[in-house]
Regions:
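Phosphate-binding/catalytic loops
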Residues: 99-203
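Acidic side chains
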Residues: 67, 85, 168-172
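Conserved active-site segments centered on acidic
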Residues: 1-84, 92-107, 197-203
Length: 203
């Protein structure tokens, strides 16, 4: 059984670490003590290991009440992709990179915004209950991600892609003012709310 959410961006200094911390925060709100059954990690397709979070990203993370001091960047490896239950990327290009590294992860790999659309559609279409992992119909927290991915995949069949494919990408704010980082973290939270909501009701 696969497990955990892996969030991927380019350098693992801004988008993916901010998303990692926001995802943990939202999971804790939704699941309380059960959030530990859904671990969240991040990595970068071109990351250099051991760097702290970008200063603007660290400041915004701290403003949300989480201490980012322990964070260190780490490069993406195929084994991470093979074992993650759900892989969320900042961009379509990074999604392609992930699948190239680990073809078996194809059906578990989405951009953050893409999975948010699918999670919203799954809730609207009422397909979540069809995807409970426990054969006797009881909710099983350990299998939340399997059920959430299955529900999103079912919803995909009836959902049109965005008119502009780039709308599934999350813009990199590195090199821009902190206002752009604030916008980025708002977009991350907007994408993660339906995602975490789907995970919460799928177990």
């Amino acid at each position: 059984m696969l497990g955990g959410v892996l969030i991927v961006c380019h350098a693992n200094l801004c988008r993916s670490p901010m998303a990692e911390y926001v995802a943990r925060e939202l999971l804790t709100r939704q699941l309380g003590g059960e959030a530990s059954a859904v671990p969240v990690a991040s990595a970068g397709t071109h990351a250099v290991p051991g760097y702290p979070m970008h200063p603007h990203a660290a400041r915004l993370t701290a403003e949300r009440g989480t201490d980012p001091e322990a964070f260190r960047s780490r490069p993406l490896h195929a084994e991470q992709l093979r074992t993650a239950g759900l892989i969320l990327t900042a961009t379509r290009a990074q999604r392609t990179t992930c699948v190239s590294l680990a073809p078996s992860a194809l059906h578990r790999t989405f951009t953050l915004r893409q999975f948010a659309r699918l999670a919203t559609a799954a809730a609207e279409q009422g397909v979540v209950e069809q995807c409970w992992a426990a054969p006797d119909g009881r909710r099983d927290p350990v299998r939340r991600l399997d059920a959430a991915v299955a529900a999103a995949s079912r919803a995909r069949a009836g959902l049109q892609p965005p008119v502009r494919p780039e709308d599934d990408d999350l813009t990199d704010p590195v090199g821009l003012p902190i206002a752009e980082f604030r916008h980025c973290v708002r977009e991350i939270e907007r994408a993660l709310r339906p995602t975490v909501g789907l995970i919460a009701v799928s177990g």
